[in-house]
Amino acid sequence: VTGLCVTCGVISGVARAQVPERREATVDFVYFTGTPRTDEARGGTAPATLRVEKNTASGASVGVIEEFAGGTGTQWRSTAWIAAFTASGRAEQSFLANEFTVRTGGHVDGPSAGMLTTAAFLALMRGDAIRPEVTMTGTINPDGTTGPVGGIPQKLMGAAAQGKKFFGYPVGCRQSEDLKTGAVVDVEALGTQLGVTTVELTTLADAYLLLTGVPLAVHAPIDLEAMRIAPDLLETTKIRVDMWRSTAEAGFARVQPILNAMDEPTRTSLRWITSPIFGAVQQATAAESAGQTIAAEHKWMEVATATAAAEDSLAILAAANAGKLDDAFNVLVPYLELEDQAKAMLGELGESVGTANNTVGAVNAVLAAEGVVGALALVGAGKGGLASAVATIKQLETSTTPESAAANNERVRAFLMLLLKTAPVLARAEATLAAARMDIAFGGTSEQGGAAVQADRLASLAKAYASASAAGKVYFQAIVGLEDSASGAFAFAEPRWATASMGTQLAADFAGRDGAVERVIALAAGAEGYLSSASLQNKYYALEYKQGVIARRPALTAQLAAARTSALAAAGDLQRLTGVLPSRIVTEFNYAEELREGSDDDKIDALAAYGRTSFAAELAAELGR
């Protein structure tokens, strides 16, 4: 492996693909349909023609052409966007350089064609022929790893019926449920029975080799020793652990007297407010005792967040019990100042790119800006909650009839519940922004290195990630059935959704603007939105996460291993490219290492952290091209 040469445009000895004038190919996608556990459950294939040609527009250009109006569902459309974006990165071409088109027949939908669509688009960009006897199923993650899907036995049988000889499926899914019988089926044994060779796919490279017979360059992973945390970085992390612990303890010192003054029934009735504190303390203490310093920092931050939310919630209830609804509302109003603070920080980070003008400095600024964008997104979700509370209380009636009194009581209860749901979101926003400040204060943007950043490259990436973020948001909403009307409520329960939705909006607002500051904000917001949506899609759809438990456990184990390998390879490329391995990337990787053997929630966070390691390293390479 020779690494990447910025001046000659060669990566690992393979010439960078050129933008094609026009290339197209037809592939057969697999699907399943019918009601599970009935004879209607069956699989099949559907042809689609994919085309790649030079883009003459200034922005991204991805289209789906239908045989019938409405014949292609939202999931399928979003899959095409994400596949085009991912394939462009692997081909080392700007997402904006090509126009991508998919022509479908009949009625198709579903999210499981991500890997096949990506591999096919990549083959068109590289000029490699697609083998007609091959098909596959599986989602694709931003780091190029595959995600599990359902209905694999039915899809395999459908592929065999159409004469396919090779069938790829996601790693960890060899034992898959037959949707007709409910029995667990060995996919490889079923393939042998049907005369189809089955291939377990871990990454896009596996899928590409199966689809084209051509191997992609596989980059050597960095040595693990290079990813160890330096002693000085470890010491600064311990300082931040102490800071978060002190913040949490100070907050609880304010909460405890309020609880002590209550009678036991009242304390018991409010346990839903205080129990998150004790659960978070237990996790933070365990991480610290195990020497998991980075995880301990994050978990003590969770304690501080839970404590602040509890303090605010108790203040809201106290004001409401005194009949002072305005005071209850005003408990949360000071948090709105975070918006201006976050925007000022984003401006400073954007200006730092123009000053330093090198790939490592730019990546550090973008990563720091992502944390600020996360805080800004949470403030946006909180503002939505407060606006709903105001709208509710404005509906109070002046009539004194029993019916009006009952209706008013319901509105007051709804008003208070909105405030109580908003309190944790705004507390998290404050903690997230504080964490971003700490990161910058402890030298999180000081490292420099690599080639100069071209302004047009920064602008192109900002537009690309804004488009990818929008596609990812729509994709997730479609596969879980999240309506726009329920989006705000879901953000209260799942902070990543606030980041995904508000990050997408912020990226769209800034993507077309001129100036380094605006481009850094757009890139950071788009990347944060895209990565958050992808993490949610993997969590709730691919891994079937429900009530704190993951259903597809073998796939989770396989994903963790694949994401880890991908992160190490990306870090190795970055070091060879710039001669620098930013401490931020090292920290993110080690955070994943500390979490990967923890609870299911920890494992989900570990996957996200490995993914962010890959993203940061790949972004540096993209900026340096």
Regions found by a protein language model. Give the residues of each.
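Generic signature of mature, soluble extracytoplasmic domains
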Residues: R267-A319
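C-terminal amphipathic alpha-helix
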Residues: V303, T307-A310, L314-P334, E370-L543, ...
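Sec/Tat signal peptide C-region and signal peptidase I cleavage site
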Residues: I11-R16
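Short helix-adjacent coil turns
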Residues: G279, A284-H298, V363, E370, ...
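Peripheral, non-AAA+ core regions of ATP-driven protein-machinery
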Residues: Q18-Q282, S313, A322, D326-L376, ...
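Acidic, serine/threonine/proline-rich low-complexity intrinsically disordered regions
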Residues: Y540-R552
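Bacterial N-terminal signal peptides
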Residues: V1-G9
